[in-house]
Amino acid sequence: MTSPADATTEVAVSQESVAMVTGAGRGIGAATAERLAAEGMAVIVVDRTEQDTRATVAAIRTAGGRARGIGCDVAVAQAVTAAVATAVEEFGRIDVLVNCAGINRDRLLLTMGDQEWDTVLDVNLGGTMRCSFAVGRHMRRQGHGRIINFSSVAARGNAGQTNYATAKGAIAGFTRTLAAELGPHGVTVNAIAPGFVATPMVDELAERLGGDRDSVMSEAAKSSAVGRIGTPEEIAATVVFVARPESGYLTGETVHVDGGRP
């Protein structure tokens, strides 16, 4: 059994550690990759294509960090297996996995087609499962690791997002169950549920609503106790906290970072 003293010596955020972040080409994923690199980790930047990873990789390297971009569609099992194999071959291990890849296809259920439903679940939930499976096997052999998934406050229910809310709600259950399975092997599994955050998705939402970015953010801020929306950097800071060795007693939880949304 691991003692409290042993827990503080686990490999997590350190200059010898390696993190893999999916959906890291923009938004929260990019901010997370850059923050982990700033903490001294080598970061495997994963997005749908290698080209999508280049801006984040360049930002990390410009700041003096270590990064490698890998193109991978998390909806394809073979692509995930290949990406993880490449990462392990090049870096030797993966200490932190951040499952940040996600999409939305918002539409009321009664007007939603099978493809819009299936695609959202396959990327958000299926991608989390595939990456956790591939990386979790390596972490189990290592005897340590952090898996950090992304749920959302939308899991509580949000009109026009039955597909997205279902996927994000399922991730919370997936997280708690996987934590029980991997805990005996020194691997913690947690999820982060952001509220409304200023990312490129805001522009996409504004376009769908026929409004502008500022008006969408202003309206969203009204539902927050702190009177504003969040930033990708604030979510990234939470990822770093969960990834730290000192957080080894935290597992199976979904951490809400939503500015006090009711």
Curated annotation (Swiss-Prot):
Entry binding sites for NADP(+): G23, A24, G25, R26, D73, V74, Y164, A165, T166, A167, K168
Query: Its pathway?
Result: Antibiotic biosynthesis; novobiocin biosynthesis
Q: Which GO terms describe its biological process?
A: fatty acid elongation; novobiocin biosynthetic process
Q: Which UniProt keywords apply?
A: Antibiotic biosynthesis, NADP, Oxidoreductase
According to the UniProt entry, what is the EC number of this protein?
Answer: 1.1.1.-
Q: Which GO terms describe its molecular function?
A: oxidoreductase activity, acting on the CH-OH group of donors, NAD or NADP as acceptor
Q: Where is the active site?
A: Y164 (proton acceptor)
Lineage: superkingdom: Bacteria
Q: List the disulfide bonds.
A: none
Residues annotated to bind substrate: S152
InterPro entries reported in the protein's UniProt record: NAD(P)-bd_dom_sf (IPR036291), Sc_DH/Rdtase_CS (IPR020904), SDR_fam (IPR002347)
For this protein, the record's Gene3D superfamilies field holds:
NAD(P)-binding Rossmann-like Domain
Question: What's the stated role of this polypeptide?
Answer: Catalytic subunit of the NovJ(2)K(2) heterotetramer that catalyzes the NADPH-dependent reduction of the tyrosyl moiety of L-beta-OH-Tyr-S-NovH intermediate to yield the tethered beta-ketotyrosyl-S-NovH in the novobiocin biosynthesis pathway. Novobiocin is an aminocoumarin family antibiotic that targets bacterial DNA gyrases.
Family (UniProt): Belongs to the short-chain dehydrogenases/reductases (SDR) family.
Q: Could you describe the subunit structure of this protein?
A: Heterotetramer; the NovJ(2)K(2) heterotetramer is composed of subunits of 2 NovJ and 2 subunits of NovK.
Q: What is this protein called?
A: Short-chain reductase protein NovJ
* The organism of origin for this protein: Streptomyces niveus
